[in-house]
Regions:
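Beta-propeller-forming repeat regions
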Residues: 1-229
């Protein structure tokens, strides 16, 4: 309950807005799901919107390795480069399942009871990288819910750079749905790994949080009496 009105609100992590693929209502990212080569495996083909057209996200090499039948009609990069998804698969999209992405922002959705949700993006500092882990808790003990967020995402194809701009963030809530991003010297959080989960954990009756990192030791941050870390 972010705004203290008695109902359940949502805090949702996402890729963030500092990545090659940027999605909006007018320029969505799409995923086409189908067994294109009829080998019993569902392929995933991604597109993004350029000048109003659905263009392939992945490189020619990656798509033709996944679907070798496309090599014959796309022998050269200059053959492949201008083609839309519809031109690549002229007869194969009508029965494909299409998923549409309209935003990559991490958001808060405030519950308006029977009137749906009001969606607002998290502050820009949290859009600089992906958010993989969230904890909502009254961290500074002022009676209002705060947000502890961490993430980064390194497991991408070489054509994309890693999403690695997050060192973890603490957002201090005002109890009305608003938040202030605590400075690192205030929060004590500075983690440059790929965080997959954050768990509240008490050690010797001292409350804190365990940050679980890919290919690294877990990191435990203890809350001080002032509620800082």
């Amino acid at each position: 309950d972010i705004d203290n009105d008695g109902d359940t609100d949502l805090v949702l992590g996402n890729l963030g807005e500092n990545f090659y693929l940027r999605a909006s209502n007018n320029a969505p990212v799409k995923v086409y799901l189908k067994d294109f080569d009829k080998n019993g495996t569902i392929e995933k083909i991604f597109s993004h919107t350029i000048n109003g057209e659905d263009m392939p996200v992945f490189l020619k090499k990656d798509i033709t390795e996944q679907l070798p039948a496309l090599k014959k009609e796309n022998l050269k990069h200059q053959d492949f480069a201008p083609k839309t998804i519809q031109a690549l698969f002229p007869n194969n999209l009508s029965d494909a399942t299409v998923l549409t992405v309209n935003t990559a922002a991490s958001i808060i959705a405030i519950n308006n009871s029977n009137k749906g949700f009001t969606v607002q993006p998290l502050p820009y500092q949290l859009q600089l990288s992906s958010i993989q882990a969230l904890v909502v808790d009254d961290i500074n003990k002022d009676g209002n819910k705060d947000i502890l967020a961490a993430g980064n995402f390194f497991d991408l194809l070489p054509q994309f750079c890693s999403i690695d701009a997050s060192y973890g963030n603490l957002l201090l809530g005002n109890g009305k749905g608003g938040f202030i991003v605590a400075k690192p010297q205030q929060s004590g959080i500075s983690i440059n790994g790929q965080i997959k989960q954050v768990l509240p954990l008490q050690v010797k009756n001292q409350p804190g949080y365990l940050f679980l990192q890919n290919n690294q030791h877990p990191l435990y941050l203890r809350k001080t009496n002032a509620g800082k870390k």
